[in-house]
Amino acid sequence: MKQYGVFDIIGPIMVGPSSSHTAGAARLGLVARHLCGEDVRKAVFYMHGSFAETYAGHGTDKALLAGIQGIRYDDERLKEAYALAEQAGLEAVFVPADLGAVHPNTVSMELTTKRGRRFTMTGCSIGGGSVCITELDGVEVTFSGERPILATRHTDEPGVIAGITAILYAYRINIGNMQVKRSADGKAACMYMELDGELPGQLKDALERVYGVKQVLLLCPEDIA
């Protein structure tokens, strides 16, 4: 049986009225910001269930918008998310949507970076500020954000994934969950891993030196705590 801490029950100290609709939403935005890896020019948020019904009144829209700008749920700037987005040239659109048989506090994001790259993420706020990520760039995942997440973009050829996992083995880092997606033309791929334990500071540099690796993104729990 899972043991619950006090912050799982009463939620974190935050800006806004609801840990599910504000703190959790801001954390979802922060996850998207980190795993997108670039500044965002446009964000479309497809709001499902209770998110769709109450996002304006509970500040869910501000929290999501703050998160993708790198603003935490306990930062007073969350209240100014729209003004800060306008200053940064960030366009945001919120669309009520039926995403199917998913958690009522679910949002699907389509982010377009300033370089024109498209990134998608779907996740839900499950209470007390906790979140669950269910999709990254079209890849089905189940990540909590409570363990480190490694995202790589690399060439789609033999040996690249082996090179990445060899580095993880060298640092004695265990892979808890792994998903890979290939591009339609077979030239590129992306990979998402949930890892166990703390990550050494030199890990990112070591992974970036692997043949075929084009980008390495690391999200640690403290980045969205």
Explain the meaning of each model-derived region.
Residues 44, 48-87:
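A structural-propensity feature for long, helix-poor, extended segments
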